[in-house]
Amino acid sequence: MKTMASFVLVLVAAFALPAAFASLETKDVITRAAYEKLVESGAIQGITMTKTIISNPILEEALVAHFNRKLGGGTIFDCGESCFLGTCYTKGCSCGEWKLCYGTNSLPESNNEKAMVASLEKDVITRAAYENLVNSGAIQGITMTKTIISNPILEEALVSHFNRKLGGGTIFDCGESCFLGTCYTKGCSCGEWKLCYGENSLAI
């Protein structure tokens, strides 16, 4: 009886645990193909309003490409303080609409209005802070850890970046992971991140 129970336990461990870990690994991850499909359909707002885990290569590629285009080599800096009675005490910094202090070379207020966050919640990355990190080449450091990004910043970067890459093509995520390098949905093939993509998705 003990031998039989042990055998059943081994079988459960062999088959159930890998499946459980696989589901943990892929749950709520938005793939490149899924993002592009959502951008193309105009449904991006739906995913940026909720907590979503984005694979690092997608997030990094979109943010680096988008903000490098906007930077144009200029110096962007976040003064690291909030306004106090409408005043910033760091030299060269001024108070923005969201009670955050920015350097004189930061983006104009008209751009900030769309993307900055009013909240000073811990770990929120503002537009100025992102651009500073992108400019310094340190983007890898923030995409490897849990970071709260304001929805307008994320939406702007992803929509802008992926709309450039889409070119009107049909993008679809096959909704399955590769199994032994194979995808079983017709017209789908295995990509670099062990996820299946349709024929018209971006080249991996």
Curated annotation (Swiss-Prot):
Coiled-coil annotated residue ranges, if any: none
Transmembrane residue ranges: none
Post-translational modification: Proteolytically processed in two steps to yield first two linear precursors, and then two cyclic peptides after removal of the N-terminal repeats (NTR) and short tails.
PROSITE patterns with a match to the protein in the record: CYCLOTIDE_MOEBIUS
UniProt keyword list: Cytolysis, Disulfide bond, Hemolysis, Knottin, Plant defense, Repeat, Signal
Disulfide partners: 79-93, 83-95, 88-101, 174-188, 178-190, 183-196
Cross-linked sites for Cyclopeptide (Gly-Asn): 73-105, 168-200
Highest taxon in the source lineage: Eukaryota
Example GO biological process: killing of cells of another organism
Propeptide: 23-72, 106-118, 119-167, 201-204
Extent of the signal sequence: 1-22
Family per record: Belongs to the cyclotide family.
Domain-related comment: The presence of a 'disulfide through disulfide knot' structurally defines those proteins as knottins.
Described function: Probably participates in a plant defense mechanism. Has a weak hemolytic activity.
More details: Tricyclon-A and tricyclon-B are hybrids of the Bracelet and Moebius subfamilies.
Protein name as it appears in the record: Pro-tricyclons
Organism, as annotated: Viola arvensis (European field pansy)
